[in-house]
Each structure stands twice: as C-alpha cells, then as structure tokens.
C-alpha cells in the first residue's frame, strides 16, 4: 500500500512538472509571437516621407517585395551590419529580377539619419522616424531588424540582430527569389 501511494505521488509530481514546463513554453511562445516579427505576419501600411522628400509606403511594396531595414545611428550592431546591408541593397535588383525595393528606417532624428546614411554609403531611400508606435507595428523592438515583405503585406523573412555573415545576406536574397510566400510560422533568427 505504501509503495503504491509513493508511486502515485511520484507520477503526480512528474505530471505536474510536465504541465508546468508546457505552460512556460506556451507563455514564452506567446510572448515572442506578440513582440517579435515572424514569417507570415501581416504588417500595416504606413505612409512616411523619406529623407529625399519622397512619399513612401511601408508595408506596401511598389514591386513584388519590400526590404525594410530598421536601425538606430548609435547602435553598435547596426554599425557592424552596415557593410552587409549595403551589399544586400547592391545585389537586390539582380536577385529579385528588379522586383524588390529597399528602404531604411532610422529610429532617429532626420539630421542624424542623413549623416549615418551618407557615412555608410546607403544608396537606398532612408526614412527618419522617431515614432515608436509605428516601429512597434512592425515589431521593431530591437535593432537592427531586417524584414522582407511580400506584395500581400506578409513577412517573408525576418532577422533580428547583427547582419554580419553571408547567411544573413543569402537569407534576404533567397526570400526575394521565391515565388510563393512562406506559411505562417514562428521564427526570427537572432544572432
């Protein structure tokens, strides 16, 4: 009888431990889903003005794809990513067959964003926006953030963190080569 009671108590402890583990995993997944960009996520369409004075629509590609690069001028990871971001911009037309546009979104004042874009030789339009609410709609809590948006307004590729490897470049270029959108699923690649 005592052995049966101990076995039952042990089984109960294991079952409760497993339920606690699953609850924590679900909470982590929900928290990440609510705060990080993910493949298949719909993004809003927001009108903004780039530093060159042109009207731009984030989340609404003029072509088949829109590559959005969120950064801040004081971020060391953004500075480290700048050379490969510039390389991505240079290879985008060839990889997408001219069906992709790239926009930089600096979460800084216009003067700082313009100086940063010139310093790093960004040949793509840059938008200066200090509106954190707009950035949060794209889940740009952490920078650098690189998103590839399809014509349907869904994220096809998301990368949070430094873009400092060829894999980061290839991920973006592969996303703009694909014909079909990826299904919704959890994932951001962090480095």
Which residue ranges define each predicted feature?
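Compositionally biased, proline/threonine/alanine/serine-rich low-complexity intrinsically disordered stretches
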Residues: 178-191
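Short, small/polar residue-rich loop motifs at catalytic or cofactor-binding pockets
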Residues: 42, 64, 141-143
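Short active-site neighborhood of thiol/selenol oxidoreductases, capturing the structured segment around
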Residues: 56-79, 85
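Short acidic-hydrophobic, aromatic-tinged amphipathic segments that line or gate anion-handling sites
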Residues: 48-49, 125-129
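Structural microenvironment flanking redox-active thiols in thiol-disulfide oxidoreductases
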Residues: 79-120, 133-136
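Hydrophobic beta-strand anchors of alpha/beta hydrolase catalytic cores
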Residues: 67-68, 102, 146
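Thiol/disulfide oxidoreductase modules built on the thioredoxin-like
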Residues: 118-122, 130-177
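N-terminal targeting signals for export/organelle localization
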Residues: 1-43, 191
